[in-house]
């Protein structure tokens, strides 16, 4: 079987792990070939040209060859982009990479998904407020994977209307809700306003409530696809719990009985 060669393909590194003594096994997402497994020989050696190039969150130009599932990476170049994310943005970048790693299959070309990945990575690395970008990416990912419901019409054939309430369930059409939404809040699925569905569909969140309901929707579908959960989200939640405990410890009562931050 002849070797298939790919040259100068833009990719994002999703994950890497040591391979034997000095090499790396890399999972990358490419624009034309989807997710690919690459063997970067000697990449862990101090003198390797690949050592400082194979980093996540930024686009890289990669060249590889091979007819097996694990290809051989023979060249990689940084093609410019943006700085590495810092603080909590780092966990957001790891979260996006984990979604890509767990929800995509190897060598399934999805150019639109590559473009969506590039957009959200730039936002996470460069913007102070990027949460709306995360919600847009999650919904585009679910759409491109074919698991998101149609947000133009409900299960009865009617248009999604801003002033109506709807129920969303994985693997089902969006259905209008006639009962009191508060009374249904304990039921399975997500109960959301029509305006929030329109905002999610258009990728433009008009209010904080709309953005919060978008999180409810995307989390519902992601949990359905990944019931075992996501490591990056679990770590971030642990950090948030620690921050809340530290804030509580730093808050002390004043002489008049009110609370005051001690720091």
From Swiss-Prot:
Q: Where is the composition biased (Polar residues)?
A: 252-263
Q: Origin, by domain of life?
A: Bacteria
Gene Ontology cellular component list: bacterial nucleoid
Does this entry carry the keyword Lipid biosynthesis? no
Alphabetical UniProt keywords: DNA damage, DNA recombination, DNA repair
Per its database record, what is this protein's job? Involved in DNA repair and RecF pathway recombination.
What name does the UniProt record give this protein?
DNA repair protein RecO
Q: Which organism is it from?
A: Neisseria meningitidis serogroup C / serotype 2a (strain ATCC 700532 / DSM 15464 / FAM18)
């Amino acid at each position: 079987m002849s070797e298939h060669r790919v040259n100068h393909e833009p990719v994002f590194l999703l994950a890497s792990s040591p391979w034997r003594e000095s090499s790396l096994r890399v999972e990358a997402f490419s624009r034309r070939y989807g997710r690919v497994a690459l063997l970067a020989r000697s990449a862990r050696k101090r003198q390797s040209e690949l050592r400082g190039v194979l980093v996540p969150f930024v686009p890289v130009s990669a060249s590889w060859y091979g007819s097996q599932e694990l290809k051989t990476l023979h060249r990689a170049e940084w093609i410019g982009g943006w700085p590495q994310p810092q603080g909590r943005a780092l966990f957001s970048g790891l979260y996006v990479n984990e979604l890509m790693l767990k929800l995509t299959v190897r060598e399934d070309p999805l150019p639109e998904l590559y473009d969506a990945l590039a957009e959200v990575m730039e936002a996470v690395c460069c913007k102070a407020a990027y949460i709306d970008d995360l919600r847009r990416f999650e919904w585009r990912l679910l759409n491109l994977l074919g698991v998101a419901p149609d947000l133009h019409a409900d299960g009865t054939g009617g248009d999604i209307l801003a002033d109506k309430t709807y129920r969303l369930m994985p693997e089902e059409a969006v259905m209008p809700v006639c009962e009191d939404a508060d009374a249904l809040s304990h039921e399975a699925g997500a109960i959301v306003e029509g305006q929030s569905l329109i905002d999610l569909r258009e990728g433009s969140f008009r209010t904080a409530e709309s953005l919060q309901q978008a999180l409810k929707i995307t989390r519902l579908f992601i949990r359905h696809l990944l019931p075992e959960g996501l490591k990056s989200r679990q770590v971030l939640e642990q950090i948030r719990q620690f921050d809340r405990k530290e804030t509580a410890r730093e808050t002390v009562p004043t002489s008049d009985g009110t609370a005051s931050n001690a720091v």
